[in-house]
Amino acid sequence: MTNEEPLPKKVRLNESDFKVLPREDLLQRWKQYEAYVQALENKYTDLNSNDVTGLRESEEKLKQQQQESARRENILVMRLATKEQEMQECTNQIQHLKQVQQPSVAQLRATMVDPAINLFFIKMKAELEQTKDKLEQAQNELSAWKFTPDSQTGKKLMAKCRMLIQENQELGRQLSQGRIAQLEAELALQKKYSEELKSSQDELNDFIIQLDEEVEGMQSTILVLQQQLKDSRQQLSQFQQQIQISGNRTPSSEPKDEGETSGKDCGRILNGPSNGGSSLQRTHSSAGLYREGSSTEDDFSASPINEGKLSNHSQERTSRDGSSYINPLSTGYESVDSPTGSENSLTHQSNDTDSNHDSQEEKPVSGKGNRTVSSRHLQNGLDSSVNVQGSVL
């Protein structure tokens, strides 16, 4: 039976039970009693066995502890012996030092007889007398300065001391206040300087923003002008090709009529009803020039060199006329886009460069003879008609 199993109940039988109970009940109770006794015996044996093992273990532990304590005792005895030895050595050293420090009579006599030590003692005695004299003099002066409350010198001296103390306090206040005022002034200057720096920084920022806006406007106008210039050059090249083809194939009367009609339309669009006469003059002049050009067309048909000169001169005139028609557009865009007049300088520079290029390109053409003159008249008539058509577009 283990410790976890419960013990059976104890059976109690009286003499009356033996007399009254039947045999079967008595046997049953006897069996229960036997089981109870058996359980007790088992428990007793278990306890005995556990006690024996526990005693053995405790005995072993006690033996180990005894051995450990014996070892410690030996160690402590050894330490005690070493300590006693050290103590004996220390006592010996102390006695030796005492003997050394206690001079003998012979040593004392030798030190007193030594002249150097005697001189040292004499000097010490003289210094002691001087200090005593100084102390006595200081005490006499202190007693002399002592005065009664009724003495006039004491009152004057105290008043003077109070006045000096007040003056010192006032001087300290003035110095501190002057320093504070100086610091406040410096602080105000620094604040003013910082405000000026901030205002200048704000102005610079505004100026930079304005410059950025102007640059953006200039870039936009430049892009528009470049696009217009590109478109105008393309249109002029197309018109030049068409005019060359029509000049080679059609008679001189048809270009005259076309020039007149296009000149009339251009005059109506550009000048309005009031400038009709000027538009008619332009058409007549362009027609006359075109007639002169048609008369000289047969002369230049055989030579490829003259054709190259004619094309070069036509390119010069088209670039010149294209720039003359682009300038009004650029001025219109400048008046709308740019907040300032900074773009006007750009357009004037472009006009100056165009005029310089025209003058440089006209120099080699001016010395070519009568054929170049007639080709120039022809090209003037063609350019006038092309300009009229471009203005209509």
UniProtKB/Swiss-Prot annotation:
<feature type="compositionally biased region" description="Basic and acidic residues">
    <location>
        <begin position="354"/>
        <end position="365"/>
    </location>
</feature>
<dbReference type="InterPro" id="IPR033757">
    <property type="entry name" value="WTAP"/>
</dbReference>
<comment type="function">
    <text>Associated component of the WMM complex, a complex that mediates N6-methyladenosine (m6A) methylation of RNAs, a modification that plays a role in the efficiency of mRNA splicing and RNA processing.</text>
</comment>
<dbReference type="GO" id="GO:0016607">
    <property type="term" value="C:nuclear speck"/>
</dbReference>
<feature type="region of interest" description="Disordered">
    <location>
        <begin position="242"/>
        <end position="393"/>
    </location>
</feature>
<dbReference type="GO" id="GO:0006397">
    <property type="term" value="P:mRNA processing"/>
</dbReference>
<comment type="similarity">
    <text>Belongs to the fl(2)d family.</text>
</comment>
<keyword id="KW-0217">Developmental protein</keyword>
<dbReference type="GO" id="GO:0000381">
    <property type="term" value="P:regulation of alternative mRNA splicing, via spliceosome"/>
</dbReference>
<feature type="compositionally biased region" description="Polar residues">
    <location>
        <begin position="321"/>
        <end position="353"/>
    </location>
</feature>
<keyword id="KW-0539">Nucleus</keyword>
<dbReference type="Pfam" id="PF17098">
    <property type="entry name" value="Wtap"/>
</dbReference>
<dbReference type="GO" id="GO:0008380">
    <property type="term" value="P:RNA splicing"/>
</dbReference>
<keyword id="KW-0507">mRNA processing</keyword>
<feature type="compositionally biased region" description="Polar residues">
    <location>
        <begin position="272"/>
        <end position="286"/>
    </location>
</feature>
<dbReference type="GO" id="GO:0005737">
    <property type="term" value="C:cytoplasm"/>
</dbReference>
<feature type="compositionally biased region" description="Polar residues">
    <location>
        <begin position="369"/>
        <end position="393"/>
    </location>
</feature>
<dbReference type="GO" id="GO:0005634">
    <property type="term" value="C:nucleus"/>
</dbReference>
<dbReference type="GO" id="GO:0016556">
    <property type="term" value="P:mRNA modification"/>
</dbReference>
<protein>
    <recommendedName>
        <fullName>Pre-mRNA-splicing regulator WTAP</fullName>
    </recommendedName>
</protein>
<feature type="compositionally biased region" description="Basic and acidic residues">
    <location>
        <begin position="254"/>
        <end position="267"/>
    </location>
</feature>
<keyword id="KW-0131">Cell cycle</keyword>
<dbReference type="GO" id="GO:0036396">
    <property type="term" value="C:RNA N6-methyladenosine methyltransferase complex"/>
</dbReference>
<keyword id="KW-0508">mRNA splicing</keyword>
<comment type="subunit">
    <text>Component of the WMM complex, a N6-methyltransferase complex composed of a catalytic subcomplex, named MAC, and of an associated subcomplex, named MACOM. Component of the MACOM subcomplex.</text>
</comment>
